[in-house]
Amino acid sequence: SLIAERQRVMAAQVALRRQQAQEEELGISHPIPLPSATELFVKKENSGGSSCLLLESSSPTHSTSTVTTVSTSPSEGRMLIQDVPSITSRGHLESTSDLVV
């Protein structure tokens, strides 16, 4: 079950990266360059109350601070994918506030 969750999260990340790469080639979604690299925060909320946070730093390309939210069906738990400018350098995150749709 946990392996399936991870595979779903990885699939969502790959799909998001492909979409961003396509939009970057077209020059649609990334008109504003940011100086620092953006971090991809994926927070998963399980029904048991335990949350799993995957932190992955994307390549330092130009990106905007638009928020992309992907939510799955409620039975699988909520999954939020958000692009934010990197506040901390590629370090470990202690705790993040809950993301609410």
From Swiss-Prot:
Residue span of region Disordered: 52-79
Subcellular localization(s) per the UniProt record: Nucleus
DNA-binding region: 1-13
GO MF, one example: metal ion binding
Gene Ontology, cellular component aspect: nucleus
InterPro entries: DMRT, DMRT1-like
Pfam families: Dmrt1
A Gene Ontology BP annotation from the UniProt entry: sex differentiation
Biased composition (Low complexity): 52-75
Keywords assigned by UniProt, alphabetized: Developmental protein, Differentiation, DNA-binding, Metal-binding, Nucleus, Sexual differentiation, Transcription, Transcription regulation, Zinc
Reported function: May be required for testis development.
Family: Belongs to the DMRT family.
Name this protein carries in UniProt: Doublesex- and mab-3-related transcription factor 1
Phylogenetic lineage: Eukaryota, Metazoa, Chordata, Craniata, Vertebrata
Gene designation per UniProt: DMRT1
